[in-house]
Amino acid sequence: IPNTMQESYQLTIKDTAGNCIYDSGVVESSSNAYIPYKGAKLQSKMRYLWTVRVSDNHGNTATATSSFETGLLSESDWSAKWVKAHKKGKKGKPGFGKQQPATLFRKQFALKDKPVKARLYATCHGTYELYLNGSRADSRLLAPEHTVYEKYLCYQTYDVTEQLTEGSNAIGMHVGDGWYLCPQSLPNMKKMDYAHAVLFQLEITYPDGSMDMIISDEDVKCSNGPVLSADLYAGEYYDANKQIKNWNCADFMDSGWTSCMEANYGYENLVSQIGEPVIIVKELPVSRLTKSPKGEWILDFGQNIAGFVRMKVNAPKGTQITLEHCEILDKQGNFFNNIQGAGGVGKGVDQKDVYVCDGTSATYEPHFTYHGFRYVRVTGIEPKAEDFTACVVSTEKENLGTFKTSDERLNRLYENIRWSQCANMLSVPTDCPQREKAGWTGDMLVYSRTALLNEDCTAFFTRWLYNMECDQDEYGIIPMVVPQDGNYPSMGKLMSMMYGVKGSGTSSGWGDAAVVVPYSMYEITGNTDILRQQYYCMRRWCDYII
């Protein structure tokens, strides 16, 4: 109906027993988003039902109902123990190329019946893939993602009810270095252990109402696997000859595996993940397969992306297939590594994945890395275009904006902007998906409004701003990169000498993101909660620069 407007709303929240937890009453308002909850404190691990009723200026009403579930809201909710592998990463002066093999963790357990409800809470030091009885728990990538780990480590919640069965079951976690042990992060991790570690807690409800809990403890076992190294910048080395079949399945014989050590890492930095996960958002076929003037095989996917290549392989045992990624070719059409040695930061950013064949047919994609690329040089085999797929990776977000004109040049410009946003919103907002992959604050200062008009970035920015608050120092200084990675304090100090206060590691063109980004969120979405959440951080930054 033309000229229809909301005149009032009523929001109620009840627990599963039907008890009313919150009733806003009828509120005369046109507000329809970011309504603050003003009820009693919610309980951990509880499902709540909410109902919203709205009325318009024509006397019509509409009602909708849904639910949400709380996670572990208190440190005391954790019964699981942190456990780590007996190996350690290389300490001392960090540098590219000092990766360690990924670790396989597993725990076998028995259930008296098939559960009617099962929730698994999990996180790690590194990045992980989670398995239940041989199957992935979900499609997310690079969990628990990039945060200020000492103060803010996300855990993820999984509904694994359908993946469990009566009798023998197994939890498997495949853990790589990720951001946690990446050489970019090591200088800021002095208080943390240089080892892969896991934490998981499985809470089960049986049909008779009884409950059970399976936790990570000294009964978790670990082993090396086929991923001999995995780095977010250098790439992944996978030897299929070292695969351990069915390692994440029930009844696998793990007697030769090593028992894990308990680690006293604590729970004070654990927070349920805010926002959507990193996933594969699109897949691209090979646009063109060519042989370069140098005689090298080049895959062209027709578009610069952030992601990785999935390939089908069927080559003799011991064949080493290498995939090297780049964004442009040289003038002659040869492979060109456009980021190597760029200002020193490109050193070791090989963007190279290696797969060693075991003589069987297989489909491979990297587990713990991603690249910025359009072109891929393939060595070790004569490739077929149909065997390769580019997997576009980004944080999952709802699309909001569109733009179309009669001028195809403008349309292409907007399309390029959207591809750039997709490639640079992966866990944190980055400057580029290949060389630095860093959360430069100045980039989001100038782009946040556009990003919010294109996609629903509310949860994505909320998490990043919480990282910013964690990285803010006692003087109110906001670092130029958030989370503050190891390579960038010195670079920030250099840039601050050029653009800001000498040696402070910050500058108004970057640190102002502490104010501009949350205010942009408020302007675009009407979200006042983000202003309340970030006010102290905003105020301290303003006090510092004044």
Where are these regions (language model features)?
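Extracellular/oxidizing-compartment recognition motifs
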Residues: 1-435, 442-443, 457-462, 475, ...
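Charged catalytic carboxylate motif
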Residues: 416, 446, 460, 513, ...
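Extended, well-ordered alpha-helical scaffold segments
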Residues: 413, 457-468, 528-545
